[in-house]
Amino acid sequence: MKRRRLAQHFLRDPSVAEYIAGLVPSGLDVIEVGPGAGALTIPLAKRSKTVYAIEIDKALAERLRGIAPPNVVIIVGDALEVEWPRADFFVSNVPYSITSPLLFKLIRHRLPAVLTIQREVAERLVARPGSEDYGRLTVAVQCFYDVEILRVLPPYVFDPPPKVYSAVVRLMPKAPCVDNFDEFEKFSAWLFSARRKTLRRLKLADSTKRVYQLTLEELVELFKRHKA
């Protein structure tokens, strides 16, 4: 089954699957979202204590049960809605249509992660202040993670091949920049809805600096002053 409605493209290249699995430390409890036919699940299971595979498609989940080793626990449901089990690491070939909400849920769990996502989204995650890619998602993720693009993947390693390139990204938790993510995220969303306006125009500071030019540290300082 090709889940075009979810914009998911299944990994088909065994060498890429082995590469991604090899990025996960051995002996951990791992959550995998969107296992599909199990191309990544099987090599993950070989090096993990437990793999919790969250699959929304019942038919695919049943097919996976037929090939998965005993240390794979299959959870049928929507990864955005089901409660995630306690785990040490997170892995996903992320369905394009849920990339942002899945990232926001991941932030709340603060798990280290290896994700395969659209290259343009990956570039947003590592974007620097002042660039066109720098925005709300950048700030939210960089507040809690060190982000690194490890590898760019061509369309032909997926089935069906997407129209764009993908990227393997590693997210490693760091000391959070704020204590209250939900409040900070709402503030960032409001700010970046006016990304080209100056702080003076927004009556936040006597500065001609524009929102998209602010560093993470400057955004945090504005947030703290706004809360006070």
From Swiss-Prot:
Keywords tagged on the record: Cytoplasm, Methyltransferase, RNA-binding, rRNA processing, S-adenosyl-L-methionine, Transferase
Pfam family for this entry, one: RrnaAD
InterPro entries, sorted: KsgA/Erm (IPR001737), rRNA_Ade_Mease_Trfase_CS (IPR020596), rRNA_Ade_methylase_Trfase_N (IPR020598), rRNA_adenine_dimethylase (IPR011530), SAM-dependent_MTases_sf (IPR029063)
GO molecular function: RNA binding; rRNA (adenine-N6,N6-)-dimethyltransferase activity
Primary location group: cytoplasm
Subcellular locations according to the entry: Cytoplasm
Example GO biological process: rRNA methylation
The keyword Transcription regulation belongs to this UniProt entry's keyword annotation: no
GO CC terms, sorted: cytoplasm
EC code(s) of this entry: 2.1.1.-
Residue numbers binding S-adenosyl-L-methionine: 9, 11, 34, 55, 78, 93
Function: Specifically dimethylates two adjacent adenosines in the loop of a conserved hairpin near the 3'-end of 16S rRNA in the 30S particle. May play a critical role in biogenesis of 30S subunits.
NCBIfam families attached to this UniProt entry: ksgA
Protein name: Probable ribosomal RNA small subunit methyltransferase A
Provenance organism: Pyrobaculum aerophilum (strain ATCC 51768 / DSM 7523 / JCM 9630 / CIP 104966 / NBRC 100827 / IM2)
